[in-house]
Amino acid sequence: MKPSEELRHCFEGKRTEDGPLICLQVFVTCALMVPQVRAPVFWPLTWAHAGLRAELCSVLIAHHPTHLKGLNPVYQDDVIVRAFETRLGFTVSSAKAATCRVTIATECPMREVVLVSSVRTPVGRAFKGTLRATRPDELAAVAIKGALDRVPQLDPKEIEDVILGCAMPEGEQGMNVARIASLRAGLPVEVSAVTINRFCSSGLQAIAMAAERIMAGGAEVMVAGGTESMSMIPMGGNKISPNPWLVDHYPDAYLSMGLTAERVAARFGITREACDAFSLRSHQKALAAIAAGKFDEETVAVPMSFTTPNGAKPKKQEITFKVDEGPRADTSLDALSALKAAFHVRGVTTAGNSSQMSDGAAATIVMSAERALALGIAPLARYVSFATAGYKPEEMGLGPVFAIPKALKLAGLQLSDIDVIELNEAFAAQALAVIQEAGIDPERVNPNGGAIALGHPLGCTGAKLTASVIRELKRRKARYGMVTMCVGGGMGAAGIFENLN
């Protein structure tokens, strides 16, 4: 029997034992899973039968208050009403519905997944910045603890697995840094962990893998994110060892990222002036966002201690790192235009219009919508879709142009449906080319600045941008947000999230 038929039987009053609890599970589950009611759970909707809605809500709460305890009435209302979406084409009898029992059909393909907490550390400049001596596993532990602190209803013992992205998983961020960070964060030893790598999209990939595992029924609660210290582990790692066959037959697979940006600029007519203007705007938006406190909700401070010389008695100092240190208030078009090209003598890419090398970490708690409901946690966002695409390594910066349509197709959306896009600014040249070739409205891109100003801690960035995009959706009362980036080696990635506030 199909889920919609089982739901109909429930509504028509076929009864067995354990009525109210199972019925509540069916209402929520079918709202989340049945294609006919695919619209997202928790999203407010207008429903004509307000009296019936209130009656049914009160019946269910009366029978099983523990399952709805702590939820405000609006939240209860939205969850339950979603299950009675009238598109199924029949009238619900609340009295019968509250006393029936059905078995959820196995045809229900996937569950909805929500993000209930998403935070990041402030981003430090690599090599000379505040975090230069802070280990990436420590940064990740701070992010994980910060994410858990936002949802005190969740017992860490419920976490099934931790997935962290890291672009250069060696040295201080080797030895399965996800496991090291989870133990450092104080998670129970029973909580497993894994480190994954898709270069610049590793953090976003981690969130997608956690979400899809929950969708498939393999877990209820996961932690996902990313960490990277470019101060400690340089781009390319400590020992670069190219594959000899590729060096002979496809050397462009190892082309430096800066030169790939130059090829994209040359192909699509991206000028030096446009790159510098884009860079300046990134700094201006980031500085304005910091001044307005827009990043306060998504960031967790990093406590630090260090010892400074003080005569015969070294002095120990403790500080708290709270604010991104990449944005420059002193930058200008004149200053940017005076910089030399960094990768090609006649190129357009400079140190000023490229992403900063950075240190940072981010963590997101991902869980099934059913579990969030049971725990009384109001989700921040719904995971909608994720897609990757391969492209020519020598023009890797164009990767998002090919990943974005795939993510939109999976979500059943159009590009015009996306209200906010966090496009990683690996280089101004490639970001401008992506905006141009993908047909993106520039006004929807990086409203609070991007990696040119705020930094790009490689494996952390996708998770960091996820924390940012869902807060911006909340501020704007907008619905859909996207995180997208190019990926070294010739790829693109894109993830779509829906605001539930």
Q: How would you label these PLM feature ranges?
A:
Residues 100, 104-180, 185, 263-272, ...:
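Conserved active-site "lid/cap" helical segment
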Residues 166-220, 251-262, 330-356, 437-464, ...:
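Conserved catalytic cysteine-centered active-site region
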Residues 120-122, 133, 137-142, 153, ...:
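N-terminal extracellular/periplasmic Venus flytrap/periplasmic-binding protein-like
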Residues 10, 19, 28-31, 50, ...:
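Short hydrophobic alpha-helical segments enriched in small aliphatic residues
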Residues 131-244, 254, 299-322, 394-395, ...:
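Conserved beta-ketoacyl condensing-enzyme motif
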Residues 104-136, 331-398, 402, 409, ...:
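Condensing-enzyme catalytic core mediating Claisen C-C bond formation in acyl metabolism
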Residues 196-227, 265-295, 363-370, 435, ...:
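Active-site-proximal alpha-helical scaffold in enzymes
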